[in-house]
Amino acid sequence: MLARTLVTPRLRLEATTPAHADGLWTATESSLSQLLVYMAWAPQASPENSRSYAERVAKRFDESIDWSFTVFHDDVVAGAISLMNYEAMFKVAEIGYWIRSDLAGRGLATEAARAVCDFGFDEVRLHRIELRAWVENAASIRIAEKLGFTREGLLREASWAQAGYQDMYIYGLLESDRKAAK
């Protein structure tokens, strides 16, 4: 049985359930102008879509397809983080995250990502975690570097959001990289 709650010094990450939908919507709404820049789903954000998202990812967690967590800081929803696009045959998943704008710059996304990478390697038994970051997203690039991810290449026009198609860097972290860094 996989852990459904991860605790770090400043955060509590709970496997996302429909009970988190309202908090996720509040966090999304408060950060919508920033999320629109990088997140393709942001233009469709709404209370109804937050509920639908929470229901969908809760089911996928239970089915060991994806693992999505709602991030809490001081008992307030601070954002979301997921291991997604799981390829069971190769033991590979991609990490994605966002933190509400008023909490940005405090290292919370790095702290949450470290906990989820540990969960991925220790509990899901992943071999590799991938991270994709827009080339202009300096904050996400810093997170990848702090966690020991290796930049492996450039994906041309691989993502779309409000600004149109954008290039992305792809990073990889192997379980052996993590062990070597400890």
Where are these regions (language model features)?
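A short helix-loop-beta-strand connector motif used in the catalytic cores of GNAT acetyltransferases and
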Residues: 55-70
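A short hydrophobic/aromatic micro-motif that marks alpha-helical segments and, especially, helix-coil
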Residues: 45-47, 61, 178-179
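Short, polar/charged, Gly/Pro-enriched helix-capping and turn/loop motifs at alpha-helix termini
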Residues: 38, 42, 64-68, 127
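Acyl-donor (CoA/ACP) binding surface of acyl/acetyltransferases
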Residues: 1-23, 27-34, 68-182
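Conserved GNAT-fold acetyl-CoA-binding loop/helix
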Residues: 33-55
